[in-house]
Structures are given as structure tokens and as C-alpha cells.
Amino acid sequence: NILLNIKQRNEKNHTINMFREVSISNDTISVKFYRNEKIECACNFLMDKDAQGYIDLSDMNLTSCHFKGDVISKVSFLSSNLQHVTFECKEIGYCNFTTATVDNVIFRCRRLHNVIFIKASGECVDFSKNILDTVDFSRSQLTHSNFRECQIRNSNFDHCYLYASHFTRAEFLSDKEISFIKSNLTAVMFDHVRISTGNFKDCITERVELTIDYSDIF
């Protein structure tokens, strides 16, 4: 009823921002609703979990949500619309963004680990200055996206479409090789990267810029 009331009022007054500030703790989501930059109300929701024990935020329209908190863990955003969402937290772990729409998503985090972006799609996604540890980007389409100054460990970019994305000063620090097998890297910037091992087999590399500060790749 709270959500319905706010939705009805929102049709008359577009200054209400649904899910402006969201924090997640265990299986509870705390939401603050704002009107004209002031809190309209605050609510806690006990959320269902999926078969894997993840908080289930799949197939939802979460456009422009602002997720805050220390750690966001075990949340499924499967097939959700996350356009213009900001994640502002220390860490995101064991989350699933498979087939999610991620246009203009900003990750203001220190670390993402054990996160899945398989077949996620979007442009202008900002991962800059994050540690990306065991992140699966395979078969995703992340064009014009920002991986500047990331530390990338044990992550997979196979079959990705990364048109015009930037890895400026990224560090690829892995126990095993970083894999871009069969990815489309057209106009991707790998300038001043540090990389020890990598697999670029069968990639499209038209207009790629690659300058390596430290590498055993060759």
C-alpha cells in the first residue's frame, strides 16, 4: 500500500524518486523515498530468496536506484533494468547480474568479487579504480565502458563486445591468464596497462591501442 500510494502521487508530482537510497542487510532491504531532496518516508522490506539463497531482485525495474552500505552480498539482479543505478559501498560479492541492463551504472566500490555479468548489456558502465576479483563478464556487451585503473584478477572477458571501452592504467594481476577469447575489442584502449599473461585468440582488434608497461605476454 505504501508503494501504491507513492506511485499514485508520483504520477502527479514527478519530484518523488522511487528507491533513491537503498541498503541491504541479510534478507532485509531498507529504502528511503525522497521528495524535493527531503526524505518522504523510510521503509524496511523482508525479501524473498531464490533457490541459491540470494536476495531476489530479479526482473525488476530499478532505474536510478542508489544502493549504499558497507557490503552488498548474495543479491540476484538477474534480468533487471539497472539503468543509471549507483552502487556506493566498500564491497560487492557473490552477486548475479546475468542478462541485466546496465547502461550508465556506476560502481563506486573498492572491490567486486565473485560477481557474474554473463550476457549483461549496457553502455557507459563505470568500474574505474575498482578491484575486480573473479568477475565473469563473458558474453556481455559493455560498450564505451570505463575500466580505468582497475586491478583485475582471475576474471573472464571471453566472447565480450567491448567497443570503445577504456582500460587505461589497468593492472591484470592473475594466477591464470586473463582471457578475451573471441571478443570484439574494436577501438578499445589498453594504454599503459600492466599485464603478465593474456589470451586474445580470435579477437577482433581493429583500432585497438595497446601499450604495455610490464608484460610477459609475448
Predicted regions and their residues:
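Tandem repeat scaffolds
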Residues: 15-218
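Extreme N-terminal basic, low-complexity initiation segments
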Residues: 2-5
